[in-house]
Amino acid sequence: MAWLTIFLIVLHLQLFVARLWAQDQYQVDLSDIEKEIQRAADKPYSLGGFLEFQPQIFGIDRDSAFSRLQFFRQRQDSTFEQYNFRLRLDGSYKKDPFSVFFKTDTHVRNDFQGWDEDAKLFEAYLSFKPVSGLALDAGKKVMKWGKGYAWNPASFIDRPKNPEDPEEALEGSTVATADYIRSFNGPLKTTTLTTVLIPVYRYVNAKFGELYHLNFGSKLYFLLYDTDLDFMVFTGSSRTTRYGFDFSKNLTTNLEIHGEFAVVNNFKLMSIDQRGLTSVRESEALSYLLGLRYLTEMETTYILEYYRNGTGFTKNQLEGFVDFVDAGDLSFRTTGDDGAIRRAKQLAKGAYGRPNPGQHYLYFRVSQKEPFDILYFTPALTSILNATDGSFVLIPELSYSPVTNLEVRLRGAILTGGKGTEYGEKQNDYRVELRLRYYFQL
């Protein structure tokens, strides 16, 4: 039934697009657009967001480790459907020298487990600019450190991105920040010093790390010889001290290179073997990322990144976890003892369940803007490869805006990998999703 629903929606959209193409060309009054832009610029406030509906179909890999963890007490069909509804609001109010910004996210989901609702305040902060070049902010915000597209190893404060959808908004952290900006003539054009205080208490950033500590972060930015450079540091008792560096430079008008480098002091990683014995590795975790973005004359965009995750598991450690799941699953099915499988499920909620828990990855994305002169249509193909075990995910997508403020995205994901590999042990073999997103501005 879900497949039929999605097919009918896509068919309706195609017929709608055909009607649009059949219409005569229309005239655009630029003066009306300019007046609308000016009216928007004169308002001290803004309020907008989007409404979203996203049906999804998941194809279950019943033999995979994460599938057996999720469904060990019940037999799940080979596919299941999920329906997602989302409301995103963001707004601001400005009255010099103060500004207020906020962003909320309300997500309602329905699947075989029933209905679930989650409302979050993504951002809400006050900004004070007493003089030119100085900004003081306090509240919940996203820091956006790092230059990587799919991963940001030098982003020590923000939550990690979803590499399969890295442009999606993230929930921020409660911080107090100060930004001081200076501009110069010569090779050094701009420098910015950012300082951050990150409190971690029971109801403030509680998941950030060890409670009841005030932590400190800082970033120094330079625009030097047309190259963006950042140097970061984070220290405090909630997390171990870490240092970072990133850069970005346009080698030509259509070729950009970027990179990140991060060191995490005294990083501890716990792993488990087939027998359930745990071991803890403590090290100076070194992570780095190198990438490029290339835009052709035909407006085809290529993004390529290599990510070395120093905080990830080795191939043997990931295989040890899978072996432990196998042993726990066998014990449950033969004796009814669910102790081991429940323990494995709890571990899967931590480091083992991260989007990319391994150590070496390649990210590739190619997108084509408006092929065949179809306005507001962008096909794309994304792939993430675990370079250690050879498993990967392939994500084709079609994005189209048939009318103003409406975005339609049809997307699939195909996961490929053998026994014991990262993508071979994910819960799903594939998924198909259709996202309808309507933007509004009040």
Regions found by a protein language model. Name each.
Residues Q23-L136, L398, E407-A413, Q427-R435:
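Beta-barrel outer-membrane channel/assembly domains of diderm bacteria
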Residues R39-A40, Y45, F53, G91-K95, ...:
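Residue-level signature of outer-membrane beta-barrel architecture
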Residues K43, T79-F85, E117-F122, L170-T174, ...:
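Residues that define the transmembrane beta-barrel architecture of outer-membrane proteins
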Residues F85-I198, F222, G417:
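Outer membrane beta-barrel
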Residues D96-F102, G133-L136, N185-T191, L224-F231, ...:
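Repeated loop/turn-to-beta-strand initiation elements of outer-membrane beta-barrel proteins
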Residues D96-F98, L223-D226, G236, S248-T382:
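Detector for outer-membrane/organellar transmembrane beta-barrel domains
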Residues S99-N110, F122, P160-K161, L193-Y201, ...:
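Transmembrane beta-strand segments that form the barrel wall of outer-membrane beta-barrel proteins
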Residues A178, F364-V366, Q427-L442:
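Outer-membrane beta-barrel "beta-signal"
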